[in-house]
């Protein structure tokens, strides 16, 4: 199913209106190398984009490599006593800011300046330039990491960066540590100076373990700080599945609160076995199964079970051992179809032809009479997403088609227009493993490539 210009124009107009509210925001990252700045940047971009705010990361390191491709950027390039290199780095940071400002003026909403920005001289230059622009607010976001395990992991990940990709690993690590030592010589953390200037900032310690915020103002800044306070990097698995087949699925009706069919109950029983194999309740079964090598979680065997309040998801959880912790929540209910609840698509075409055409043109903002659209679902799922970011144990979520699409769009960073076209079949478990720069997704039978295929009309 292809999107036409007519289809996408509805969403474009909606985004224009949504992004008009409040000033634009620049987030300046601050911190030593390998402290999680890019990790935080990508998490924020994904969260804010999913909420409908145009968000983009501007990485100074990428521009630096292009601007001075003839020079080897080893540790000596970052020595504060290397005047030529220091001048180049400062200029590249300002050039990146110019590109960032130009993008904001052309319709962007949130821009992230991903760099060390570790000296007061650099930060004062950034403040001076961005303060000249009307309707652009800014804040600094410093990532501090003192956990040796996290640091070692971050350093190992740096081996995949363009600066070290073709270098012997041990040589690369030694050079990177020397680079960090050079940064430490000139590093000046956020604090009293920024407060005297009344600059907004947040300091994040050990990727979300602790946060300190100062002068945080406005909706976007507060959302960023709130989100950062709930993230972590612990391993865990998020299982997503739709309810078993319901009577309405069989009859081609939407919404409502129907029971499961016999086929749906068979899936419910199979789902309970699936969970027991991977997260056994009994201590004697604590040893992970062979299948757990693919699907096992980071929660040490503990599994939470979440369902919507609707009958078909509650019935899908019926066969689970009573010792599993079960939470039911309205946030996970299917998109509400208003006056069209319990109708078939043919019925809707006949009774509400104009509303049907509008919704088919763009499901993100189109809705049936008295019902929700996809953006409404995103808004009510925001607390669920934040809770999933906070949760350090594994969780199995039994929910519905549109909610599944919306959650998958968040975790994969999928474009919101593509989200409405995502095929999410019944009786299938998606196993999501959040990683530093994305998410691994697998079915029970192996690795999955999500394809955008013609979906059901719902």
Regions found by a protein language model. Name each.
Residues 33:
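The conserved Walker
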Residues 73-87, 130-190:
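A glycine- and Lys/Arg-enriched "phosphate-lid" helix/loop adjacent to the NTP-binding pocket
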Residues 17-23, 104-105, 388-390:
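Phosphate-binding P-loop
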């Amino acid at each position: 199913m292809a999107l036409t210009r007519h289809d996408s124009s509805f969403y474009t107009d909606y985004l224009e209106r949504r992004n008009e509210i409040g000033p634009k925001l620049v987030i300046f990252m601050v911190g030593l190398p390998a402290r999680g700045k890019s990790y935080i940047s990508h998490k924020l971009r994904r969260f804010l984009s999913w909420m409908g705010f145009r968000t983009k990361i501007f990485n100074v390191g990428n521009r630096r490599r292009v601007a001075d491709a003839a020079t080897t950027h080893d540790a000596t390039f970052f020595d504060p006593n290397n005047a030529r290199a220091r001048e180049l780095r400062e200029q590249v940071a300002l050039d990146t800011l110019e590109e960032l400002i130009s993008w904001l003026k052309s319709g962007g909403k949130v821009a992230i300046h991903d760099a060390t920005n570790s000296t007061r001289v650099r930060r004062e230059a950034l403040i001076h330039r961005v303060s000249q622009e009307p309707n652009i607010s800014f804040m600094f976001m410093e990532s501090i990491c003192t956990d040796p395990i996290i640091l070692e992991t971050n350093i190992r990940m740096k081996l995949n960066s363009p600066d070290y990709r073709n270098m012997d690993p041990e040589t690369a690590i030694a050079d990177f540590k020397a680079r960090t030592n050079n940064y430490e010589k000139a590093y000046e953390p956020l604090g009293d100076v920024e407060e005297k200037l009344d600059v907004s900032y947040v300091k994040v310690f050990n990727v979300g373990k602790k946060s300190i915020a100062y002068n945080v103002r406005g909706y976007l800044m507060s959302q960023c700080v709130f989100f950062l306070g709930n993230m972590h990097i612990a391993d865990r698995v998020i299982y997503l599945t739709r309810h078993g087949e319901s009577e309405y699925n069989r009859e081609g009706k939407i919404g409502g609160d129907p029971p499961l069919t016999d086929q749906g109950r068979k899936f419910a029983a199979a789902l309970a076995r699936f969970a027991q194999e991977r997260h056994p309740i009994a201590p004697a079964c604590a040893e992970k199964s062979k299948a757990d090598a693919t699907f096992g979680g980071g929660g040490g065997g503990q599994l939470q079970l979440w369902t919507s309040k609707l009958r078909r998801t509650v019935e899908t959880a019926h066969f689970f051992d009573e010792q599993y912790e079960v939470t039911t929540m309205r946030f996970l209910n299917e998109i509400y179809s208003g006056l069209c609840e319990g109708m078939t698509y043919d019925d809707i075409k006949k009774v509400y032809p104009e509303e049907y055409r509008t919704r088919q043109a763009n499901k993100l903002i189109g809705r049936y009479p008295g019902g929700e659209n996809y953006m409404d679902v995103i808004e009510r799922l925001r607390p669920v997403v934040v809770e999933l970011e906070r949760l350090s144990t594994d969780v199995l979520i039994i929910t519905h088609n549109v909610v599944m699409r919306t959650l998958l769009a968040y975790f994969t960073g999928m474009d919101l227009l593509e989200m409405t076209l995502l095929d999410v079949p019944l009786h299938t478990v998606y196993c999501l493993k959040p990683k530093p720069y994305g998410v691994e997704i697998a079915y029970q039978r192996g690795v999955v490539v999500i394809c955008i295929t013609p979906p059901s009309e719902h």
